[in-house]
Amino acid sequence: MGAASGSIGVLNAPTNLLTRLIHHRYRLRFQVERPAQGFFTSLLCCSGPFAVYRRSLLAGLWPRYLTQTFAGVRCTNGDDLHLTNLILATGRQVLFEPRAVASTWVPRTLRLYLRQQLRWNRSFYRELRWTFAGIRSRHPYLALDVLARALLPLLLAAALVLLASEGLLVGWELLAADLTLAVAMLCLTAAFLLAHGASVSFLLLYGPLHMGLLVPVRVWALLTLADPCWETR
């Protein structure tokens, strides 16, 4: 075992609607997404607020960790993801322990939240070369997980364009069939999330928030990877 991380809760969840939405997003992340990665003993990111590392491994990784550069610029943030990638590259297990629980404060304003998401997404895209290097000999599910998250903005944009073009070029009957299938998939997803503790407000509001704000933030992060402005607060 090279490193491990646990579940993280939200201390200020009751503050407002945004913090409650983030709280439910955290529940989905630490009850569904992280356990799936942990099942293959290859957690893709040991969260900064709550992680442990094998000390004997760190001694050999510090030089690479402290001198990391991207596009000729020294990297000063995104440290939890890069350190996890370096551990994965050693071939050691990186475990997820759901029974170990910590709590953190999350952004309480939309401005702070979007700045946080911009920083996280820049880190995610910048780290892709190290992420794939760390998981190349591991279970294929991990590569699919990373690819799905990396391509999500393009896939969502392409889906919207295809739906619109189908209605104009092929006929509204085919578009209606596609929308029916999409609604059915959304219903199945909603049932799954509700079974895992998500609220109705999360299901109704997080989708528009993701499409309207977080997808553009992810695209902007991809276009501005070399921007050294990383501070969240």
Model-based region annotation:
Residues 148-229:
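Membrane-embedded multi-pass helical conduit in multi-pass membrane proteins
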